[in-house]
Amino acid sequence: MPQGGEPGQEEGQRTELVHKVRNWHLEDMGSRADTVPVDTLSLGFQVHNHAYKRAMSNVQLGNIGAAWMPAMVSQMPLSRHFLFTESYTHVFTQPEEWLYYNSTTPYTNLYYQYSGPKARSEEVLGVLFSQNVNRKWNVGFSYDLTSSVGKYNAQKVDNRNFRVFSSYSGKVYEIYGNYIYSKADHLENGGIVDEDHILNPEKYDWGRSNNIPVQFYTASNRIDNNRLYISQALKIGKIAVSQGESGKRQTPLATVLHSLDIDRSRRLHRIDELARMYNESEGNFFYSNIYADTTMTSDSLYYTRVANTVQLKFNEEANTLLR
């Protein structure tokens, strides 16, 4: 896995510090590090919607940060842990997506995006800071905020993701630590009352889209997630592997890997306006039956997962039987 930065270059008696940033992520259950080059180009800068960044074909609710799903089967998840976060993968990210850094100087990245008008505004804020304590040890944090009002009433989105991370990459021992807090707080209007308002707007005098009546005005869905993830690797033994004309290099015989993943999620669904909307005589309410409380609903669900994994990875180059 990536090691510390290079020493400075000497020019006479003066030492010049070389500015260099390396980043990578862990794959295959944390058993392999894959380098990710730092992108300094503006390619794709116009793609600001999280859904299109992750899937070119998708189904979404429209405003930035809202729930979405890929439309292509090949991009749909093969497994899931917490069902209610499946349509918010841009908020509740996985360990394979987390980047680690190694830099010779402190590295800061700020991103801000705004679109109007103010009454229907969308905002995206991203903050990243990373700094090496020494050549092998790095610490940093990232914060992402996405908020939007939406085109229609009760479409407000508030997504937040905060991550504190640290990594130590030695020749024999490596460890990665992460604490992540993620939140998705969304209003859900249940759709417009009558689609004729959209298909034949000349028949109505709503003026703006946010005046069109919707099913719910205070129905909300909030998901909170706290996650602690630690991954470590210990390299065992040494063997010299031939590299042709370039000579030989030292490589470990095997690697013992251990990861601890503590994942805690809560989902809260609320509707505070049932008393105002519910009328048994009309018989056309959004829900055909209400069994508990006709004034409000507050349904909560908690999910906790603890995964403690130990792996033993053999070096194929060191054992001909594994090739």
Residue ranges and their predicted role:
Residues Q3-Q9, Q94-T104, T108-R135, S142, ...:
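Primarily recognizes Gram-negative and organellar outer-membrane beta-barrels
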Residues G4-T104:
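Acidic, small-polar-rich N-terminal luminal/periplasmic segments of exported/outer-membrane proteins
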